[in-house]
């Protein structure tokens, strides 16, 4: 898995940063892409990346501000033109279905696939055999969600060396043993696959927040995450301004990462007042509190768990 930052700016696009969108690439895990927010020109950013719209399975919208949703109609239309025909699910606050459907209807856009809308409330919003996703309210004036994506633990690897030491040669029997089955070998021995499977591989946790000021709900969403993606619209000494505008500072994000025991913090949603050099200063001050911090730039790619 990896995170691809398609847009990392706040409010309006700038020369250095487009508005918000983040792709969670899970090509190795489930051959799909999940998208978190879709600001204006997100599809242009996708053309500059390795992402293919045909792989897009789900879109998660954090809130209904324009810099997080204005890219949806064009992206959905282009997906159709490019041959995307698999169903797509869009999760988000109340109003997301009306916004998308109205935009497509008034523009006369017909899609080659079905969109399923899930207008969410806090709690579990998706689960299958591989992942579960929960959402909770943040604090941004309008309803804004944070998402917690949990990869379920994976079965441990089959210990081929141990099998070889016990005189079991590689072959079709390995698949049955990997499934934990009890197998009778050609020589009459009966062995239990569970005795040859290693410890389960712990799944990853990714927390991706929408716009927010400091709020108690953040802690549970971020707790023990492998990666926390948090807005940092303002520098640390502008906490009062950040609160008034319902946003966060670098230091507030770093303090949350430290308290929540996350492994890596990635700062995004950077105000256009900070050019690339000033953004480096934002990173430096966040690192004074939480060392394993990165600041995202457009088209930056972060492998999960590295």
Swiss-Prot record:
EC number: 3.1.26.11
GO MF term set: 3'-tRNA processing endoribonuclease activity; zinc ion binding
Substrates-to-products reaction catalysed: Endonucleolytic cleavage of RNA, removing extra 3' nucleotides from tRNA precursor, generating 3' termini of tRNAs. A 3'-hydroxy group is left at the tRNA terminus and a 5'-phosphoryl group is left at the trailer molecule
Cofactor, free-text remark: Binds 2 Zn(2+) ions.
Cofactor: Zn(2+)
Alphabetized UniProt keyword annotations: Endonuclease, Hydrolase, Metal-binding, Nuclease, tRNA processing, Zinc
InterPro entries: Metallo-B-lactamas, RibonucZ/Hydroxyglut_hydro, RNase_Z/BN
Pfam family, one: Lactamase_B_2
Residues engaged in binding Zn(2+) 2: 67-68, 211, 269
Chain sites annotated for binding Zn(2+) 1: 63, 65, 140, 211
Transmembrane segments: none
Active site: 67 (proton acceptor)
CDD domains: RNaseZ_ZiPD-like_MBL-fold
Subunit structure: Homodimer.
Function comment: Zinc phosphodiesterase, which displays some tRNA 3'-processing endonuclease activity. Probably involved in tRNA maturation, by removing a 3'-trailer from precursor tRNA.
Family indicated by similarity: Belongs to the RNase Z family.
NCBIfam families named among the record's database cross-references: PRK00055.1-1, PRK00055.1-3, RNase_Z
Protein's UniProt name: Ribonuclease Z
Organism in which the protein naturally occurs: Listeria monocytogenes serotype 4b (strain CLIP80459)
